[in-house]
From Swiss-Prot:
It comes from Schizosaccharomyces pombe (strain 972 / ATCC 24843) (Fission yeast). The gene is pap1. It is found in: Nucleus; Cytoplasm. A motif (Nuclear export signal) lies at residues 515-533. InterPro entries: AP-1-like, bZIP, bZIP_sf, TF_PAP1, Yap1_redox_dom_sf. Belongs to the bZIP family. YAP subfamily. This is AP-1-like transcription factor. Residues 501-532 are annotated as: c-CRD.
Length: 552
């Protein structure tokens, strides 16, 4: 048995020769299919193993392939992505082009409309310029005068135009058509309808002028220029108009003459320039009037009309008895400026025995309040005129006129005690008349109120040879350095010549280099040095000369 097993093991270890041809056939086939294959018994290198890895994978799973890393192509996208992008860019460009064309078309339409409107406006302006040139030519041919209206004039008091030009210009303010044959002259100006009542009246023009106290000079100048003076009535024969148009206030006429009489002998242009100069200069005192209040102007505007009616000797004609009674009532009121006696009695103007005292209230407003002492029967036929107290009046002067002088400066209130004082020093210590002042101290100042003055007097009387304290000069027999003037001697202040606005303008136009003056600049310089007073704006003559010398 042992011998058989040995023979079997030996035979198993020996390769069989017949199996070799089959193995060679398989190798040749595998060589054609997968390439050369090394002997299984031989050892393989790492490079050979790497080369053989795909083949091993194919043997394991020949159909499954690993996925690539990165973005995967979608089946929905077109085959050519660049073509799709180009088409989108072309669509956006066409859209922008259409929008731009639409904007340009809109802008062209807007510019056309603007051009047409501008052309129309230019045509209208050219036509307006031609009309103004035609009006200017007509105005140059006519003898129209430009006059400034009165300052602070109430237009409701008079409906008549102040100049012939103003009444004629109302028809030309809308322009003159080239087709209309318009020829203007001073004689062709139509009078207002109010004058027709006077033309139909039986009274003559001279009687009317004498009736309303119009000076002949004003009548001649007004008839030549077609103007109305402040005192000219409104030509209506109604009683109320006759009463209202009566010249109650002389101050308005005075103001008008002050403006028109700036200087004698000048032409109309110089007078007009003088009015403007005075108006600008008067703004330094806060007023635009041509000339300020004068000394002849009533001091209290509230009693202005009443005082003028009281002073007037010729009463206005009354077409009705009731208006005449109202005038008598107005005249019966006293002039408050002249007398304010509380105990004064007034007899009724209607012949009665009733009398009433002046109101005890010191205020001027109490004069215009109704008095219960007057019988109502006296006033049953009186026509009250509300315009009498509602119209504008010029501002009143200061009630403390005695405290101020005409130049607007304060008077020397302490003249009784300090007339010997020196301007540059203290009253007692530095005055040249200090000793005289101390000697008469008891007369001027009571000892109980000013004991120190008494003490100084005793000191000086007891020590005549010593120098007084506080630098007072020594008074003695040997003191001949300064002669003391008498007590009543007063050193007058330096007087300054002040010029009113008309006088200043007269100096300006009489200057040899007047044509080269800058009036606005000169007026602004003079305004800084102007002084306000009750008589108007005043300027120091030296300031005026200094301002005029700058142009030399």
């Amino acid at each position: 048995m042992s011998g058989q097993t040995e023979t079997l093991s030996s035979t198993s270890n020996i390769p069989i020769a017949k199996a070799e041809p089959e193995q060679s056939a398989d190798f040749s086939a595998s060589h054609k299919k997968r390439g050369p294959v090394s002997d299984r018994s031989s050892r393989r290198t790492s490079s050979e193993e790497v080369d053989l890895m795909p083949n091993v994978d194919d043997e394991v799973d020949g159909d499954v392939k690993p996925k690539k890393i990165g973005r995967k192509n979608s089946d929905q996208e077109p085959s050519s992505k660049r073509k799709a992008q180009n088409r989108a860019a072309q669509r956006a460009f066409r859209k922008r082009k259409e929008d731009h064309l639409k904007a340009l078309e809109t802008q062209v339409v807007t510019l056309k409309e603007l051009h047409s409107s501008t052309t129309l406006e230019n045509d209208q302006l050219r036509q307006k310029v031609r009309q103004l040139e035609e009006e200017l030519r007509i105005l140059k041919d006519g003898s129209f005068t430009f006059e400034m209206s009165l300052p602070h004039r109430n237009p409701s008091l008079s409906s008549l135009p102040t100049t012939g030009f103003s009444s004629n210009f109302a028809h030309m303010k809308d322009g003159i058509s080239p087709q209309s044959n318009l020829h203007l002259s001073p004689n062709s100006i139509e009078k207002p309808n109010m004058h027709q009542n006077v033309l139909h009246n039986d009274r003559s023009a001279d009687n009317l002028n004498h009736r309303y106290q119009v000076p002949p000079t004003l009548v001649d100048s007004n008839s030549a220029q077609g103007t109305l003076s402040p005192e000219t009535p409104s030509s209506s024969d109604s009683p109320s108009n006759l009463y209202l148009n009566y010249p109650k206030r002389k101050s308005i006429t005075h103001l008008h003459h002050d403006c028109s009489a700036l200087s004698n002998g000048e032409n109309g242009e110089d007078v007009a320039d003088g009015k403007q100069f005075c108006q600008k200069l008067s703004t330094a005192c806060g007023s635009i009037a041509c000339s300020m209040l004068t000394k002849t102007t009533p001091h209290r505007a509230s009693v202005d009309i009443l005082s003028n009616l009281h002073e007037s000797t010729v009463s206005p004609p009354m077409a009705d008895e009731s208006v005449q009674r109202s005038s008598e009532v107005s005249k019966s009121i006293p002039n408050v400026e002249l007398s304010l006696n509380v105990n004064q009695q007034f007899v009724s103007p209607f012949g009665g025995t009733d009398s009433f005292p002046l109101p005890t209230d010191t205020g001027l407003d109490s004069l215009f309040e109704p008095d219960s002492a007057i019988e109502n029967s006296h006033l049953k036929n009186v026509v009250m005129e509300p315009e009498l107290f509602q119209a504008w009046r010029e501002p009143a002067e200061s009630l403390d006129k005695e405290f101020f002088n005409d130049e607007g400066e304060i008077d020397d209130v302490f003249h009784n005690y300090f007339h010997n004082s020196n301007e540059n020093g203290d009253l007692i210590t530095n005055s040249l008349h200090g000793l005289d002042f101390l000697e008469n101290a008891n007369e001027s100042f009571p000892e109980q109120m000013y004991p120190f003055i008494k003490h100084n007097k005793d000191y000086i009387s007891n020590h005549p040879d010593e120098v007084p304290p506080d630098g007072l000069p020594q008074k003695g027999k040997h003191d001949t350095s300064s002669q003391m003037p008498s007590e009543n001697e007063i050193v007058p202040a330096k007087e300054r010549a002040y010029l009113s606005c008309p006088k200043v303008w007269s100096k300006i136009i009489n200057h040899p280099r007047f044509e080269s003056f800058d009036i606005d600049d000169l007026c602004s310089k003079l305004k800084n040095k102007a002084k306000c007073s009750s008589s108007g704006v005043l300027l120091d003559e030296r300031d005026v000369e200094a301002a005029l010398n700058q142009f030399n």
